[in-house]
């Protein structure tokens, strides 16, 4: 690129500011979208200046193409990629403008070249920094000699434009794939051999019957029942032997208890029996003249209520039956309990 004029430098500064405002919100941007934004911004920058009123359309279009070419030059490193880094693009654009327009003082918003001026109506001036507080005045030193002004640096040569990347060679057409060989027919599966017949199971030995060993019949039947075998007919009714020793012992014990009970009954529970002898009757004769110091006279003719007693009555009372021999009238029926000799028998009737 040739050295730009002051008008082009003013357009470049305005272009850089508007591009920064348009894409600075993103970190990565597609290259195609970056070029579209550059065309729109170039059109706005050129149209909003006074150039549109003083130059022909051909010159205005060339200025637009100049700004677009600058955007392409900045993004040359991303020409083969689909996206680009926004911060890198803005940094390269500012470096390009500094290198191209270092000989011009582009600090004002409006730059004029004769009667032609370039202004940015949409960009406000940068805020001025606040003035620093004035230091206290120091004692004035002696005036030093004024230094000589430094010589202006020689203008830097314009950087050579980067060489355009060589066009990529057209890709060679991919060779046609060789036709695949026809697949070989799958071999027919071999016939499966006939399955061998399963061997016949060995005959099961029949179980022995429990009645073959009568001495262990009950044990054999119990073992079969524990294993769930109830097919033996000899185990349906198991005849139990009679335990004669047990029943004989029970019978002997019963006989002994009966004999012992009989003697106990006769000894303690049966009524005593007395023989009707003359000696017992003579002992029961008492003298009527016995004096008890109370002048009580026991009359032998007193009736004690024993008249009319039959043999059957004595049997009911469990008393001994008197013999056939006549009993003297003075005899008295003995009491159930034995009475010692010489003691009088009181009458059952009240004493008069």
UniProtKB/Swiss-Prot annotation:
Source organism superkingdom: Viruses
Residues covered by region (Hydrophobic): 244-264
Keywords associated with the record: Capsid protein, Late protein, Virion
Region described as Disordered: 122-214
Cellular location(s): Virion
Biased composition range(s): Basic residues: 129-145
Compositionally biased intervals (Pro residues): 146-204
Record-level GO cellular component terms: viral capsid
Subunit structure: Interacts with the major capsid protein.
Domain notes from UniProt: The hydrophobic region might anchor the protein in the underlying inner membrane.
Role noted for this protein: One of the minor capsid proteins that constitute a network internal to the major capsid proteins and outside the lipid membrane. The minor capsid protein P14 does not serve a cross-linking function between neighboring capsomers, it may play a role in the viral capsid assembly.
Protein name: Minor capsid protein P14
Organism of this sequence: Paramecium bursaria Chlorella virus 1 (PBCV-1)
Gene, per the UniProt record: A500L
